[in-house]
Every structure is written in C-alpha cells, then in structure tokens.
Swiss-Prot record:
This is Translational regulator CsrA. Keywords: Bacterial flagellum biogenesis, Cytoplasm, Repressor, RNA-binding, Translation regulation. It is found in: Cytoplasm. Pfam families: CsrA. The gene is csrA. A translational regulator that binds mRNA to regulate translation initiation and/or mRNA stability. Usually binds in the 5'-UTR at or near the Shine-Dalgarno sequence preventing ribosome-binding, thus repressing translation. Its main target seems to be the major flagellin gene, while its function is anatagonized by FliW. It comes from the Bacteria. It comes from Oleidesulfovibrio alaskensis (strain ATCC BAA-1058 / DSM 17464 / G20) (Desulfovibrio alaskensis). Its main location: cytoplasm. Signal peptide: none annotated. The keyword Repressor applies. Homodimer; the beta-strands of each monomer intercalate to form a hydrophobic core, while the alpha-helices form wings that extend away from the core. GO terms for cellular component: cytosol.
Length: 78
C-alpha cells in the first residue's frame, strides 16, 4: 500500500484521468473529492463488497435450487 500525506486543498493523480483532492479534515473524518471520467464507476468499499458478495452468492446456485425454480415456473404456467 502506498501511503501519502496530503493537506486540505492538495491533490494527487491516479494515472492521467483520476484526480483525488483532500477537501477537509475534521476529527476522524476526511472529505475527499474525486474527479473521474464519466464512464468510470466509483463505489464506496462497503457497497462494492456487498455487491461482490451477492454476485458470488448468486453464482452458487445448486441443482436443487434450479429444479425448485423450474417446478415453480411450470406450476405458475398451468
């Protein structure tokens, strides 16, 4: 992990297109501003982890789950 020290108003770049600016520091809270290209998605870590875990869980569908879903679908079709 790269550790950098920045003061409010100071920035750093990731590559050529991502600019991170320290906006303020108040106690244990740091506000940052992100300038990123419009086609890039930015997630807070806790949101990213939750979505990742849900996607992994969705991939763990068992044969029994598929059979139950098929039976429900056929039952509704009648």
């Amino acid at each position: 992990m790269l550790i950098l020290t920045r003061r409010p108003g100071e920035s750093l770049y990731l590559g050529d297109t991502i600019k991170i600016t320290v906006l303020s520091v108040q106690g244990k809270q740091i506000k940052i501003g992100l300038d990123v290209p419009g086609d890039m998605t930015v997630y807070r870590e806790e949101v990213y982890m939750r979505v990742r875990d849900q996607n992994r869980q969705a991939l763990e569908t068992s044969d029994a789950d598929l059979l139950a879903a098929t039976q429900l679908w056929h039952a509704k079709k009648k």
